[in-house]
């Protein structure tokens, strides 16, 4: 384990040693004219690397995307968000233009529906909506009290010897056998008290 650590450190040192200083004027537009090493510190007597970016980011208020410059942020806003200002934007990350619009009235919504599906359906739906509003949004049907009463009146589900629920509406095989004519007498097993089902 120590040998592998030593080899990895040795490889890093070797890679650092191969990064030799660039010769003066070796590349066109070389900012290091005196042959300084890239990233050298000023304390070594060499000129520092010119800083292109100060490390701060500008975040988009809508989608929180980071940008290095204000110009890039403005271009992003124009392209992706339609150049909306921070005050004009709503909450959330959506970019849809319809979401920020005010809610349409019921009449406008029904008019739009009418153009799509036909006047008869919309008129009927409008009447139903009016009736629901008059009734206090209570849809026709059973009340909660009535539903609770029906649940209470349900018979208790019997369980058979295997732990499965026995359906009450379907007669057992023995009951079906008893319903046939001439089969109303007890079977020999039942006479002995053995509850064997047919």
UniProtKB/Swiss-Prot annotation:
Biased composition (Basic and acidic residues): 71-80, 104-128, 167-177
Signal peptide limits: 1-19
Protein role: Secreted effector that translocates into the nuclei of host cells to reprogram the expression of immunity-associated genes by binding to effector binding elements (EBEs) in rice. Binds the 5'-CAATCTTC-3' EBE of promoters from targeted rice genes and probably recruits a yet to be determined host repressor. Causes ambivalent immunity with increased susceptibility to the hemibiotrophic pathogens Magnaporthe oryzae and Xanthomonas oryzae pv. oryzae, but enhances resistance to Cochliobolus miyabeanus, a necrotrophic pathogen.
Main subcellular localisation: secreted
TM segment ranges: none
The keyword Disulfide bond belongs to this UniProt entry's keyword annotation: no
Name of the encoding gene: HTR1
Any one of the GO BP annotations: effector-mediated suppression of host innate immune response
Species: Pyricularia oryzae (strain 70-15 / ATCC MYA-4617 / FGSC 8958) (Rice blast fungus)
Phenotype of gene-disrupted mutants: Does not affect vegetative growth, conidiation, conidial germination, nor appressorium formation, but leads to significantly reduced virulence to rice.
InterPro entries named in the record: Znf_C2H2_type
Inducing stimuli: Expressed during multiple stages of host plant infection, including prepenetration, early biotrophy, late biotrophy, transition and necrotrophy.
Record-given protein name: Host transcription reprogramming factor 1
Keywords: Host nucleus, Metal-binding, Repressor, Secreted, Signal, Transcription, Transcription regulation, Virulence, Zinc, Zinc-finger
Keyword Zinc-finger assigned: yes
Zn finger (C2H2-type) location: 58-81
Subcellular location: Secreted; Host nucleus
Entry GO MF terms: DNA-binding transcription repressor activity, RNA polymerase II-specific; RNA polymerase II core promoter sequence-specific DNA binding; zinc ion binding
Annotated region (Disordered), positions in chain: 21-59, 71-198
Cellular component GO terms, alphabetical: cytoplasm; extracellular region; host cell nucleus; hyphal membrane
């Amino acid at each position: 384990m120590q040998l592998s650590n030593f080899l990895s450190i040795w490889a890093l040192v070797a890679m650092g040693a191969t990064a030799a200083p660039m010769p003066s004027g070796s590349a066109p537009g070389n900012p290091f004219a005196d042959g300084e090493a890239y990233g050298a510190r000023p304390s070594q007597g060499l000129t520092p690397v010119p800083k292109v970016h100060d490390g701060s980011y500008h975040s988009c208020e809508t989608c929180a995307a980071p940008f290095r410059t204000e110009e890039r942020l403005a271009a992003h806003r124009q392209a992706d968000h339609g150049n909306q200002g921070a005050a004009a934007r709503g909450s959330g990350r959506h970019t849809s233009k319809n979401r920020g619009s005010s809610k349409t009235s019921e009449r406008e919504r029904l008019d739009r529906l009418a153009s799509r599906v036909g006047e008869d359906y919309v008129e009927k739906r409008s009447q139903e909506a009016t009736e629901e509003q008059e009734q206090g949004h209570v849809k026709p049907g059973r009340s909660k009290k009535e539903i609770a009463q029906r649940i209470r009146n349900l018979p208790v589900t019997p369980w058979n010897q295997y732990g499965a629920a026995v359906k009450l509406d379907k007669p057992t095989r023995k009951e079906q056998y008893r319903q046939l004519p001439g089969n109303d007498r007890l079977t020999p097993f039942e006479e002995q008290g053995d509850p064997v089902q047919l």
